[in-house]
């Protein structure tokens, strides 16, 4: 699965879990794409949301745990 699909899945799940809004997810993806184009860097959506104060590290880890559990099914 592509990296972008993984990022969208993370963001959608975080929104579904009530940690962020869909608007915050879309803005984080926009930041990610702009940085990738401008600087050739790729920051994870979770790190962008953390740095912008929209998620805590505990929330990020909770989302990642659920994603991992779903992958193992």
Each predicted region: which residue ranges?
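Non-catalytic accessory regions
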Residues: 1-73
């Amino acid at each position: 699965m592509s990296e972008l699909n993984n990022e969208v899945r993370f963001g959608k799940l975080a929104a579904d879990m009530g940690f962020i809004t869909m608007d915050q997810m879309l803005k984080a993806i926009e930041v990610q794409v702009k940085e990738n184009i401008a600087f050739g860097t790729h920051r994870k959506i979770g790190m962008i949301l953390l740095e912008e104060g929209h998620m805590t590290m505990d929330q990020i880890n909770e989302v990642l745990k659920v994603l991992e559990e779903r992958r193992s099914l």
